[in-house]
Swiss-Prot record:
Subcellular location field: Cytoplasm
Motif interval(s): 'KMSKS' region: 268-272
Cofactor info, note text: Binds 1 zinc ion per subunit.
Entry protein name: Cysteine--tRNA ligase
A Pfam family assignment: DALR_2
Keywords attached to this entry: Aminoacyl-tRNA synthetase, ATP-binding, Cytoplasm, Ligase, Metal-binding, Nucleotide-binding, Protein biosynthesis, Zinc
Family assignment from sequence similarity: Belongs to the class-I aminoacyl-tRNA synthetase family.
Gene Ontology MF, one: zinc ion binding
Gene: cysS
Length: 467
């Protein structure tokens, strides 16, 4: 399996980097101050697929995604609404978790919150001060960027270029690039009850230190994969790498992986442009798995253009895959109820599995993997009424497993075989239809419907599914 490493700017073989069959993975979560948007959804869904594929390959994945529950934006909203930092953060964490459930994103192994790790953060900062990488000014603690010689390597920017960035201007800092590890309490922090005791006075942690602390606590250093959106490369991940490298003296992360943006009418989605699309709003019009499917239709390192037309195309494509799986399952239930048929032509399931894996091994190329699934669905539809029970089961298990790598159709219930009594009623209904006794045929159909079973008439006889 090959993955693009942002640090090296190269495609690298995962097997050459990961030790054994255990992968440790950290992905930056949301800052919980507002409803989450489809940019958050893209990152969450992609890294969920990354995790699922690693598990498909036989790896045990320890997956950590944090919640930033104390931050300037959270505090500003809390003050504006007359609430505490905790009240604001907990509300939007809860909303985010609802969105993730709708998108069928698996729960991470750990979901730590910043406020639960204040002692760990203080200890980490103290270590950086002792090693000469950080300094204290009037209750604030800053990381001194020039003390870390590898700064800029992740974002591929020189120190001269970085001097031109606006980075927390403060004339007290030793260098314009220095960034906050700990912020002394301000009036807004006190109003929002977002202050914590520390050796440097009451205050709260800076943004970047949080992820260094929590990734090290739950995964150790070094760990295998660090993920996030492309917008986090600088300054967040650059600063995070500097902190962790300075603290532990080793490259903290083996592979840095970043997904690209979602665009609205050719522009990056952002609050400043007023073009934010919230997950919850899309979910009012589309099933969660349709949105999930859409988010996987572009390669993760390419921008994804969001339009209603694109979502409608995704819906139709998703339903094509789903109907193939349902039809196959109905056929399996039919064969179990009314008896097997002789094997038809041999079906090469392994070819589809191989090509799906080739696509995913090629830097998680989900569009190509989806294309293989559509070919597979075409085969299912073409051969549906020629399969033996064994062949149908083999196709079902293979197709369902590959779709599961993308997080699709996992909650779909199997179509049951009918009892002998119900099978006789189906035969009676088919006879009634042939005799044009539609009143009896409809009565039998309605009786099944009352029990949640929908009878479906096909050119090859009656099939059914549970509603």
């Amino acid at each position: 399996m090959e993955v693009y490493n942002t640090l090296s700017r190269k495609i690298e073989k995962l097997e050459d980097i990961v030790d054994g069959k255990r992968v440790k993975m950290y992905v930056c979560g949301i800052t919980a101050y507002d409803y989450s948007h489809i940019g958050h959804a893209r990152s969450a869904v992609f890294f969920d697929v990354f995790r699922r594929y690693l598990e498909y390959l036989g790896y045990e994945v320890v997956y950590v995604q944090n919640f930033t529950d104390v931050d300037d934006k959270i505090i500003n909203r809390a003050v504006k609404e007359g609430k505490t930092q905790k009240e604001v953060a907990e509300k939007f964490i809860e909303e985010y978790l609802k969105d993730m459930e709708a998108l069928n994103v698996k729960k991470p192994t750990y979901q730590p919150k910043v406020t639960e790790h204040i002692p760990d953060i203080i200890e980490f900062i103290q270590n950086l001060i002792e090693k000469g990488y950080a300094y204290v000014i009037d209750g604030d603690v800053y990381f001194h960027v020039p003390a870390f010689e590898h700064y800029g390597e992740l974002s591929k920017q020189s120190l001269e270029e970085l001097n031109r960035h606006r980075i927390e201007p403060d004339e007290r800092k030793r260098d314009v690039k220095d960034f906050a590890l700990w912020k002394s309490a301000k009036e807004a922090d006190l109003k929002a009850q977002a202050v914590f005791d520390s050796p440097w006075g009451r205050g709260r942690p800076g943004w970047h230190i949080e992820c260094s602390v929590m990734s090290a606590k739950y995964l150790g250093v070094p760990f295998d994969i660090h993920g996030g959106g492309k917008d986090l490369i600088f300054p967040h991940h650059e600063n995070e790498r500097a902190q962790s490298f300075a603290r532990f003296g080793v490259e903290p992360v083996k592979i840095w992986v970043h997904n690209d943006f979602i665009r609205i009418k050719g522009e990056k989605m952002s609050k400043s442009l007023g073009n934010i699309v919230r997950i919850r709003d899309v979910l009012q019009r589309y099933e969660g798995e349709v949105l999930r499917y859409f988010l996987l239709t572009a390669h993760y390192r390419s921008p994804l253009d969001y339009t209603e037309e694109a979502l409608e195309r995704a819906k139709r494509a998703y339903e094509y895959l789903r109907s193939a799986l349902i039809n196959l399952d109905m056929e399996i239930a039919y064969l179990k109820t009314f008896g097997d048929r002789k094997e038809g032509n041999q079906v090469d399931v392994e070819d589809y599995i191989r090509r799906f894996e080739e696509a995913m091994n090629r830097d998680l190329h989900t569009p190509d993997a989806i294309a293989v699934l559509h070919e597979f669905a075409g085969l299912i539809n073409k051969s549906l009424y020629e399969l033996s029970l064994n062949q149908a089961e083999e196709l079902y298990e293979a197709f369902k497993r590959l779709c599961g790598v993308l997080g699709l159709f996992e909650k779909m219930e199997r179509v049951p075989a009918l009892s002998r009594e119900d099978a006789e009623k189906v035969v009676e209904r088919e006879r009634a239809r042939k005799e044009r006794n539609f009143e009896l045929a409809d009565a039998i159909r309605d009786e099944f419907a009352k029990r949640g079973i929908r009878l479906i008439d096909t050119p090859k006889g009656t099939r059914w599914r549970v509603e």
